[in-house]
């Protein structure tokens, strides 16, 4: 079987690795904007092209006799790549454009949840101009300001160190109104966690919970990023997430897929639910229509079920006939990013990977030239420790990072006992 992966980041490197482990011995191909050495090493062939160039991607898929495509990033979904592939008779793991909209139009997503009585939304309003904007911000008091469109996780700002007062929140919202709608939401207090699921249009196969860390600097300071690292626990939960919390989060995702199915376009691919665990249970921060990055790198190395079987079940609508299983291990993923990331990243600097021991290595936004690897303006290399405990997995990941050299920055605190305990204590205080 010939399988194509779209995208050239760390998430796609993890997807490619999972496909390459298949006992079905698929021939793997890729379309990516820059040569990711981790993906290229696993491929029979690859095309360097814009991942949003639908005509070129479909043409390449036809040329190579591709039977299934795994679409990694969100941008190709937003331009209808899954639609074009399916219309060409090629199976796509990735939803069609009108249901992928749940990610790339946050205003539509909130209204969709409201219209379908799906639990988990905070108080919110969508604004296309300044009328009533200041009054609503003042009414809520503490707010989150979100551009409606795709921002790579970096456009959202919340009250606190990012927006010190309602005046700053108003000014930021006004700055986003140029060419886009703005979503103003109640700023929820709690701990964030991610639940991801393979979806075949009606059935969901859930992966272990993960907690991502968006802030650039240790102790959760600095600007938002695409994600500096993440961890998962061996029981599929998180130290601050109960079975009941997870049940409610999954029920929200199931209700969302059921409602999307009623639109006459089945949602086939990955549904990513980013939740915040509050005093009143899990609430939805956002939905994404693909694997998270870095969260894919936590869960895919644990996948026991053959990835080709999972992809086939997604495409054919038969996930209910497949037992999708994961190893009961803990993981810690840490990113090395260019110095100055995300605001003023150091570009075109060589990255040298030394002895990473037992860690897994996933290349992200880098490029290979003359046998050497260089940074771009985004996250460079991720390492993943896999062990029986989060603490042991963190040690594996951190030791690996220490042996990757270049003009790079990383967070040492992700997955450490101190940071994990801080999350647990925070939730204990909130639940009182």
Curated annotation (Swiss-Prot):
List the cofactors. Answer: Mg(2+); Mn(2+)
Q: Where along the chain is ATP bound?
A: 137-194
List the top taxonomic levels of the source.
Archaea, Methanobacteriati, Methanobacteriota, Stenosarchaea group, Methanomicrobia
Write out the residues that bind Mg(2+) 2. Answer: 286, 288
Organism in which the protein naturally occurs: Methanococcoides burtonii (strain DSM 6242 / NBRC 107633 / OCM 468 / ACE-M)
Q: Which domain of life is it from?
A: Archaea
Name the residues that bind Mg(2+) 1. Answer: 274, 286
Q: In which pathway does it act?
A: Purine metabolism; IMP biosynthesis via de novo pathway; N(1)-(5-phospho-D-ribosyl)glycinamide from 5-phospho-alpha-D-ribose 1-diphosphate: step 2/2
Q: Which HAMAP family does UniProt cross-reference here?
A: GARS (MF_00138)
Keywords assigned by UniProt, alphabetized: ATP-binding, Ligase, Magnesium, Manganese, Metal-binding, Nucleotide-binding, Purine biosynthesis
Q: Which SUPFAM superfamilies match?
A: Glutathione synthetase ATP-binding domain-like, PreATP-grasp domain, Rudiment single hybrid motif
- Which positions does UniProt annotate for Mn(2+) 2 binding? 286, 288
GO BP annotations, alphabetical order: 'de novo' IMP biosynthetic process; purine nucleobase biosynthetic process
Q: What residue intervals traverse the membrane?
A: none
Q: Which PROSITE patterns match?
A: ATP_GRASP (PS50975), GARS (PS00184)
- Name this polypeptide is given: Phosphoribosylamine--glycine ligase
Q: What class of enzyme is it?
A: ligase
Q: Which reaction does it catalyse?
A: 5-phospho-beta-D-ribosylamine + glycine + ATP = N(1)-(5-phospho-beta-D-ribosyl)glycinamide + ADP + phosphate + H(+)
Q: How is the cofactor bound?
A: Binds 2 magnesium or manganese ions per subunit.
